[in-house]
Amino acid sequence: PVKKVFTSRWNSDQFGMRGKILEADFAQLEFRVAALLSQDKVAMQEVSTGFDVHSYTAQIISEAGQPTTRQEAKAHTFAPLYGATGYGRTKAEAEYYTHFMDKYKGIAKWHKKLGDEAINLGRIKIPSGRQYAFPDVERRRSGTPTHFTMIKNYPVQGFATGDIVPIVLLEIEKRLDQKDLKSMLVNTVHDSVVLDVHPLEEKDVLGIIKDVNDNLKKIIEDYYDIDVNVPMLLESKIGDNWLDVKDVV
């Protein structure tokens, strides 16, 4: 696997230990963002209680006649957030997509609101101020707008990886600078942040990630002047290379 070749630049034995690769990854960021933006009560409750949504997805598809593992179910769990439907899927899988909108009525209602906004104003706007233009959007005979997949997808992806992840990067970088650390940010992939950790700074860097995680609500609220009533979670993994990172307890 390619990730195994990514190791710390501080890989000598000068200090009796080697540098580490740390990956700080948001837990179910898009689902949490969808819960926040839609204020769906069921989704908010599941986020708050740590409900295992992937196992639930597997259960729905399996009960519809297609035995499915939790890992296999992951491909479907959040797909409706991005505009995916049951079209072109097996009958059992399609059952889950219908079930999703029945279960998360607040998200379904929010999707409709976004569609109406796009038709009436030619654009949609999210709480950060980010806007997406749809100048040629029209209402189909079915009542749904054209470009509906993008209309449903952009707010979730935009607020999650376009608005939240960048400010977290800034907060991590600011704290690294304040402590005058050699450790540095080296990469981001979707909703995860990768750092190269100096061998003498592991405790400091883990402390920074914990501090950012503990203050995520305030960080987002201060940047975008919104009320964040859905918990966000930044989890850390660390190891000798990017592939072999382990959860930080």
Which residues make up each language-model segment?
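Conserved catalytic core of nucleotide polymerization and phosphodiester-bond processing enzymes
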Residues: 1-249
